[in-house]
Amino acid sequence: MLRPTGPDDAHHLRAIRQRPEVMYRWGTVEDEFPMGDEPTATRFTIFVGDETAGMVQYSEEDEPDYRSAEIDIFLDPRFHDQGLGPDALSALIRHLMEDRGHHRVVLSVDADNAQAIRAYEKTGFRRVGLMHKSGRVPGTSAWKDEYLMELVREPLDE
């Protein structure tokens, strides 16, 4: 289901990112996407069989006193409402907590993206708060609100 993103995935991921429903949330596709546009991000391509369905990514805060990971995901709209998002997120969260040693995972999501919010809550995330005018609506000068969401492993080892 998840595989580290490589150059062979670029064409398929770029095609998904250029779909209007995805571009509305993620903005225009950078020339270097997905291999060089965010050097601090680690990315995994989501597959259903042999078909590219989307991508998850994370960035890490390595400072021991603030260690956490921030994640993001997009799916080809053809794969929405099939449980694929929560499954991919669960696999990524297991990797981050079990293999990478994180106890906290955060994300931000457009406040009007009810479908994504449901998927995140199904995965165990909770809303921390609403961030007002936290980013621009891609391709416009309008501001959008986002929820900050987190998942914290309990109980924490002291």
Describe these PLM feature segments.
Residues 12, 70, 87, 104, ...:
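Amphipathic alpha-helical recognition patches that constitute DNA-binding helices
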Residues 81-95, 117-122:
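Conserved acetyl-CoA-binding loop-helix of GNAT-fold acetyltransferases
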Residues 21-80, 95, 152-156:
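Acetyl-CoA-dependent GNAT
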Residues 106-109, 126-143, 148:
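Conserved catalytic-core motifs of GNAT/GCN5-like acyltransferases
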Residues 85, 89, 113-116, 133-138:
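Short glycine/proline-centered loop/turn elements that form peptide/ligand docking sites
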Residues 5, 75, 109:
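Hydrophobic adenine-recognition pocket in adenosine-nucleotide-binding enzymes
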